[in-house]
Amino acid sequence: MRIEICIAKEKMTKMPNGAVDALKEELTRRISKRYDDVEVIVKATSNDGLSVTRTADKDSAKTFVQETLKDTWKSADEWFVH
């Protein structure tokens, strides 16, 4: 599964150093519990976005990734140490 998270450039510049790598690691850890061969890409773009590809159950996988991403952001104080 390939997960591409696009974060608006103006938001990305406000993130603390190391936040993008920490987010990739945490999402990979959480999503790998349910799916094999997970690749998470986080990049700066003009708009926020999410795409999930290379999976047979695309709709349910995207829903799972959206929920996991939301939970990961909410719990950032628990896993992100800067």
Curated annotation (Swiss-Prot):
It comes from the Bacteria. One of its GO terms (biological process) is DNA repair. Coiled coil: none annotated. Keywords: DNA damage, DNA repair. SUPFAM superfamilies: DNA damage-inducible protein DinI. This is DinI-like protein Z3916/ECs3483. It comes from Escherichia coli O157:H7.
